[in-house]
Amino acid sequence: MTIPLEIQQRCQQLKTELQRASYAYYVLDDPFIPDSVYDQLYRELEDIEKRYPQLITPDSPTQRVGDKISSQFVSVRHNIPLYSLENAFNLEELNKWGNRWQRYVNETQDTEYVCELKIDGSALALTYENGFLVRGVTRGDGVTGEDITPNVRTIRSIPLRLNIDNPPAIVEVRGEAFLPLDTFDKINQEREEKRESLFANPRNAAAGTLRQLDPKIVDKRRLQFFAYTLHLDDNNITNQWQSLDRLESMGFLVNPHRQLCPSLQQVAQYYQDWQEKRHQLAYMTDGVVVKINDLQRQNRLGFTQKFPRWAIALKYPAEEVPTVVKDIIINVGRTGAVTPMAVMEPVQVAGTTVQRATLHNSDRVAELDIRVGDTVIIRKAGEIIPEVVRILPELRPNHTSPFQMPTNCPECQSPLVRPVGEAVTRCVNSSCPAILRGSVVHWASRDALDIRGLGEKVVILLIEQGLVTAISDLYSLEKTEIAKLDRMGEKSALNLITAMAQSKNQSWSRVLYGLGIRYVGSVNAKILAESFRTVEELANASVTDLASIYGIGEEIAQSVYDWFRIEANRDLVAKLQAAGLQFAAAAKTTTTKATLAGKTFVITGTLPTLKREEAKELIEKAGGKVTGSVSKKTDYLVLGEAAGSKLEKALELGITQLTEAQLLELIKA
């Protein structure tokens, strides 16, 4: 069907005007048309697109909110790792960082810095192809994140199409999605009216919103987005300040309170000013991000295993507020650690309602001499974990008694043990309900087996009914058994059975993390799973074998070794293997396309995610050749952290340098 020219022109006119109005409203905060006019124009565009679907384009304002996502979010690898930042908690630590970077590049002069407010939200990585938004991904572990593109498209301060002539093939943008405080309050008010659980703080609400399976819900919550990093091949951009200006010109909302500081002395003043003024903002911040402005100097400084050397997050001091202790209870964790907790009158700390705070251990309880009825000062350590800082003895009521740590586990009544040299008291009964409960919840957690629907309440019901006495029991549960549990039913039971079946496809590193071995976090689990391709290899490794792996120290090595010496743990592994869980690394896929045929590579330094042997294997499978030294025959030098003389030689010979991300793109080409 031929579309009349005047209809085509009107459609484009409406799109342009609505995009301009949206930018003025959500980015510039300076609307030029009333909402009623916007709605009228929007409906007109909708009507045209319904009659002529050929006119629908990905950047149309009508295409921001899509249909429900059919299944779980897909994990994708970041093209460029999304590093977290090193933290400094005072000006002394800021100055130490300044001295460190100067020593690293052998400089004695200070430099120019860009200061930006550290927004308390969720980091996102956006990819634009030929100017159009094609992907929005969560930070995840920095290497891989979840593809939440349908939800990202609903955020009005993220342009669907870049405001740029002749856009590059690829543009990467990083920034923070967040909820303004008034929006957060409104959401919690609505949830309270519906008798739904309240969000603890705006950061949690933003993260939870982004993982919604229905973009319409995300759209209603009106998330905002501040852009702060631009990855774009443009020789005209030489510093971070220019990057931020370019992001603004492309149509992004960039925090207006950024400042260019000629020295760390001015950085300190900026930090102190905003520490005082931060509560005047319409959103939460938890510090200041300091970046070296010069991009060439950033490149020279590079990255550590975790952080960029050219940036640091200067956190605000924790807020401290008084409250009254109503009770002191004992919490038993999944590792058996017994932690005293203060139950208090509810109080707001750093934007969150706090009713409990950790007392850490028996030594800390004795040091504080904390008692029920005491008025205490609490704060959030790193603005995350509430803790009791001190008591106010002058406000202590009469006839209080010192708190006594129990000698038996409050959950199973087994004698508690305090290992020599440790501050933590432990329950060592592997059948303790609290340890089992914590272990199963950990097994089902997002970074482990990610079993949707298996939260703490369901776990408690399964344990109380005697259906689960070990993690392995999860995989022999019947739908009818689950359906009989309180508030479950047939549909929920089927969903849970399906989620547990899907968990059998999770990787060996996730399974290893899910086992809950002391000191083995998700990152350590990945390192171990890469070094030991099967559980048998890991179980048979000596402490020396384990400790020799980069990133695995003596403490972790001893813990892993000891865990596999316990018969009950070996039995658990055997049962989980029999249930079909993955206890071996997946076979590495081969590349059939010889995309690197005839090319010679040299690898130098430590790569962000690949071991050198893994990078070599990928190159060779793609038809390339890897040599140990740079010569005129070298086509590419693959650069990692701490590149040495090979880089100097490559620069001298004019050899092309590649990052790990660029190498992977070359292989895929």
From Swiss-Prot:
Signal peptide extent: none
Keyword Ubl conjugation found: no
UniProt keyword annotations, A-Z: DNA damage, DNA repair, DNA replication, Ligase, Magnesium, Manganese, Metal-binding, NAD, Zinc
Binding site for Zn(2+): C409, C412, C427, C432
EC category name: ligase
GO molecular function, one term: DNA binding
Active site: K118 (n6-amp-lysine intermediate)
SUPFAM superfamilies recorded: BRCT domain, DNA ligase/mRNA capping enzyme, catalytic domain, Nucleic acid-binding proteins, RuvA domain 2-like
Methyltransferase among keywords: no
Record: residues binding NAD(+): D35, S36, V37, Y38, D39, S84, L85, E116, R139, E176, K291, K315
Alphabetized Pfam families for the sequence: BRCT, DNA_ligase_aden, DNA_ligase_OB, DNA_ligase_ZBD, HHH_2, HHH_5, Nlig-Ia
EC number(s) reported in the record: 6.5.1.2
Entries under NCBIfam families matching the protein: dnlj (TIGR00575), PRK07956.1 (NF005932)
HAMAP family given in the database record: DNA_ligase_A
Name of the protein this chain belongs to: DNA ligase
